Protein backbone atom coordinates (compact mmCIF):
# COMPACT_ATOMS: atom_id res chain seq x y z
CA UNK A 1 0.00 0.00 0.00
CA UNK A 2 2.78 2.43 0.97
CA UNK A 3 4.52 1.72 -2.33
CA UNK A 4 1.37 2.58 -4.30
CA UNK A 5 0.91 5.87 -2.47
CA UNK A 6 4.56 6.82 -2.95
CA UNK A 7 4.41 5.88 -6.65
CA UNK A 8 1.29 8.02 -7.13
CA UNK A 9 2.96 11.02 -5.48
CA UNK A 10 6.18 10.55 -7.44
CA UNK A 11 4.23 10.31 -10.70
CA UNK A 12 2.82 13.82 -10.19
CA UNK A 13 6.32 15.34 -10.20
CA UNK A 14 7.61 15.86 -13.73
CA UNK A 15 10.95 14.31 -14.61
CA UNK A 16 13.68 16.91 -15.03
CA UNK A 17 14.23 18.01 -18.62
CA UNK A 18 17.71 18.41 -20.04
CA UNK A 19 19.29 21.66 -18.81
CA UNK A 20 18.58 24.65 -21.07
CA UNK A 21 20.31 27.91 -21.83
CA UNK A 22 18.57 31.06 -20.60
CA UNK A 23 16.79 32.75 -23.52
CA UNK A 24 16.02 35.98 -21.61
CA UNK A 25 12.26 35.44 -21.94
CA UNK A 26 10.87 35.90 -18.40
CA UNK A 27 8.46 33.35 -16.98
CA UNK A 28 6.11 33.35 -14.00
CA UNK A 29 5.97 30.37 -11.66
CA UNK A 30 2.52 30.23 -10.05
CA UNK A 31 2.09 28.35 -6.77
CA UNK A 32 -1.60 27.93 -5.97
CA UNK A 33 -3.56 25.92 -3.44
CA UNK A 34 -4.70 25.65 0.16
CA UNK A 35 -2.18 26.14 2.96
CA UNK A 36 -2.62 23.86 5.98
CA UNK A 37 0.36 24.90 8.13
CA UNK A 38 1.16 28.60 7.79
CA UNK A 39 4.04 28.74 10.32
CA UNK A 40 5.82 25.82 8.65
CA UNK A 41 5.32 27.36 5.22
CA UNK A 42 6.77 30.67 6.43
CA UNK A 43 9.82 28.83 7.81
CA UNK A 44 10.19 27.10 4.42
CA UNK A 45 10.04 30.49 2.63
CA UNK A 46 12.69 31.88 5.01
CA UNK A 47 14.96 28.94 4.21
CA UNK A 48 14.55 29.56 0.48
CA UNK A 49 15.55 33.20 1.06
CA UNK A 50 18.55 32.26 3.22
CA UNK A 51 19.72 29.68 0.68
CA UNK A 52 20.37 32.42 -1.89
CA UNK A 53 19.02 30.30 -4.74
CA UNK A 54 16.51 32.93 -5.88
CA UNK A 55 19.27 35.58 -5.88
CA UNK A 56 21.56 33.34 -7.95
CA UNK A 57 18.81 32.66 -10.49
CA UNK A 58 17.32 36.17 -10.69
CA UNK A 59 13.99 35.08 -9.16
CA UNK A 60 11.75 37.20 -6.98
CA UNK A 61 8.19 37.29 -5.64
CA UNK A 62 5.68 39.50 -7.45
CA UNK A 63 3.00 39.36 -4.77
CA UNK A 64 2.15 38.56 -1.18
CA UNK A 65 0.44 35.14 -1.02
CA UNK A 66 -2.91 36.36 0.38
CA UNK A 67 -5.44 38.49 -1.52
CA UNK A 68 -6.25 42.05 -0.50
CA UNK A 69 -9.64 41.86 -2.24
CA UNK A 70 -11.91 39.33 -3.94
CA UNK A 71 -13.94 40.56 -6.90
CA UNK A 72 -15.57 37.30 -7.92
CA UNK A 73 -16.14 33.91 -6.33
CA UNK A 74 -15.50 32.72 -2.79
CA UNK A 75 -11.95 31.49 -2.29
CA UNK A 76 -11.26 29.35 0.77
CA UNK A 77 -9.77 31.25 3.70
CA UNK A 78 -6.50 29.33 3.42
CA UNK A 79 -5.98 29.78 -0.35
CA UNK A 80 -2.43 30.78 -1.28
CA UNK A 81 -1.39 32.14 -4.64
CA UNK A 82 2.23 33.12 -5.07
CA UNK A 83 3.87 34.39 -8.25
CA UNK A 84 7.64 34.08 -8.68
CA UNK A 85 9.31 35.76 -11.66
CA UNK A 86 12.34 34.14 -13.28
CA UNK A 87 14.40 35.62 -16.13
CA UNK A 88 13.76 32.49 -18.23
CA UNK A 89 12.36 28.96 -18.17
CA UNK A 90 15.89 27.57 -17.88
CA UNK A 91 16.34 29.30 -14.52
CA UNK A 92 12.89 28.24 -13.25
CA UNK A 93 13.85 24.66 -14.12
CA UNK A 94 17.30 25.11 -12.55
CA UNK A 95 15.53 26.11 -9.33
CA UNK A 96 12.88 23.39 -9.35
CA UNK A 97 15.17 20.51 -10.30
CA UNK A 98 18.16 21.63 -8.22
CA UNK A 99 19.55 19.31 -5.56
CA UNK A 100 19.18 22.16 -3.06
CA UNK A 101 15.46 22.52 -3.72
CA UNK A 102 14.50 18.87 -4.22
CA UNK A 103 16.67 17.38 -1.45
CA UNK A 104 16.82 20.15 1.17
CA UNK A 105 14.17 22.85 0.76
CA UNK A 106 11.11 21.13 -0.72
CA UNK A 107 11.03 18.40 1.99
CA UNK A 108 10.53 21.18 4.58
CA UNK A 109 6.94 21.62 3.36
CA UNK A 110 6.15 17.90 2.89
CA UNK A 111 5.34 14.88 5.11
CA UNK A 112 2.83 16.00 6.20
CA UNK A 113 2.15 18.58 3.53
CA UNK A 114 2.08 22.20 4.70
CA UNK A 115 -0.28 22.76 1.77
CA UNK A 116 -1.66 21.17 -1.38
CA UNK A 117 -0.20 23.18 -4.24
CA UNK A 118 -0.27 23.14 -8.00
CA UNK A 119 2.92 24.67 -9.43
CA UNK A 120 2.78 25.88 -13.03
CA UNK A 121 4.97 28.12 -15.19
CA UNK A 122 3.72 30.67 -17.73
CA UNK A 123 5.49 32.93 -20.21
CA UNK A 124 5.41 36.60 -19.33
CA UNK A 125 3.76 38.77 -21.97
CA UNK A 126 5.34 42.06 -23.01
CA UNK A 127 3.88 45.36 -21.91
CA UNK A 128 1.45 46.75 -24.49
CA UNK A 129 3.08 49.31 -26.78
CA UNK A 130 0.71 52.09 -25.70
CA UNK A 131 1.57 51.53 -22.04
CA UNK A 132 5.31 50.81 -22.31
CA UNK A 133 6.42 54.42 -21.85
CA UNK A 134 4.21 54.81 -18.79
CA UNK A 135 5.34 51.70 -16.93
CA UNK A 136 8.84 51.07 -18.27
CA UNK A 137 10.51 47.77 -18.97
CA UNK A 138 10.52 44.68 -16.81
CA UNK A 139 13.85 43.63 -18.33
CA UNK A 140 16.68 42.23 -16.26
CA UNK A 141 19.83 44.37 -16.13
CA UNK A 142 22.24 41.47 -15.78
CA UNK A 143 22.34 37.80 -16.77
CA UNK A 144 21.58 35.01 -14.31
CA UNK A 145 23.08 31.64 -15.23
CA UNK A 146 21.04 28.72 -13.93
CA UNK A 147 23.31 26.15 -15.58
CA UNK A 148 25.63 26.26 -12.57
CA UNK A 149 22.96 24.98 -10.18
CA UNK A 150 23.57 21.35 -9.17
CA UNK A 151 20.73 19.11 -10.39
CA UNK A 152 18.97 16.63 -8.10
CA UNK A 153 19.68 12.99 -8.83
CA UNK A 154 16.49 11.20 -9.87
Residue locations for each model-derived region?
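Short, flexible helix/strand-to-coil boundary loops that buttress conserved ligand/catalytic motifs
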Residues: 45, 96, 105-109
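Short S/T/G/P-rich N-terminal loop/turn motif that feeds into the first structured element of a domain
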Residues: 5-80, 86-94, 121-154
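Short cationic/low-complexity microdomains
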Residues: 94-100
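A common structural junction motif
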Residues: 52, 100-106
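Conserved short beta-strand edge segments in small beta-sheet-based binding/regulatory domains
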Residues: 60, 105-122
Amino acid sequence: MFELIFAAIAATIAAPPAPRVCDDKPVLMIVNGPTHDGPRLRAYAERIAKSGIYDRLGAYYLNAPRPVATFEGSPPANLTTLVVRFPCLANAEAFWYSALYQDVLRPLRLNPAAGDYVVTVYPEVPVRAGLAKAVGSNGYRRRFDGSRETRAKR
